[in-house]
Amino acid sequence: MNKTITSIVAALFLMTTVYAQNTKEMATIYDFKALNNKGEEVDMAQYKGKVLMIVNTASKCGFTPQYDGLEALYKKYQDQGLVILGFPCDQFKHQEPGTDEEIAEFCRLNHGVTFPLMKKIDVFGENAHPIFKYLTQQVPTEEVHGLKDKATMKLVDGLSKSEGREEGGVRWNFTKFLISKDGSVIKRFAPVAKPEEIEADIEAMLK
């Protein structure tokens, strides 16, 4: 009987935890957890005091070369407190079809990626990961400058909406969210924003 009661209590606790991760009331990014590409749980609270960049990635996208720029930023600022987390996603025209193991190997061999890669997830829709629901609620829009970039994002908008992306949702692969040392979501960068264009913001937040 005691074992049964214990099991019921544990199940209720798990359901409560899952529900909590899907609410809007989460105070900061540190209230969330995610799985890395090895299936291990990662508590975002471990990044308190760090500048955090969260990026949804893909291996077969026109923006995939941005892996190089992201890795360059990581190597340059890692010791100063920058953490980059890559969340692979296959929702945009199936541009990330591989397994987590295949994705990790691709990133290592082709782009020398050493920053942490997470388990492949959805970033919009019913099954969107709670972290991305939270991020897009905090910063639902991004600035795009220049006629060429605006034209690119207009095209991307149409494509992502055809995939079922909701208003305010992540518009394409390599959308970047920059989070301050206290867990505040400070800025959202469009896929067209190259990693090196974000460097000044990172430097300012690391001070």
Describe each PLM feature range.
Residues 1-4:
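Positively charged n-region of N-terminal signal peptides that target proteins for export
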Residues 7-17:
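Bacterial N-terminal signal peptides
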Residues 21-45:
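N-terminal "domain-start" segment that seeds a small globular fold
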Residues 50-51, 59-60, 64-88, 107-111:
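Conserved helix-turn-beta segment immediately C-terminal to the redox Cys motif
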Residues 81-98, 114-125:
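Thiol-based oxidoreductase modules, predominantly thioredoxin-like and allied folds used
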Residues 112-192:
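Thiol/selenol-based redox catalytic cores and closely related redox-interacting motifs
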Residues 187-206:
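Non-catalytic, surface beta->alpha helical segment in thiol-disulfide oxidoreductase systems
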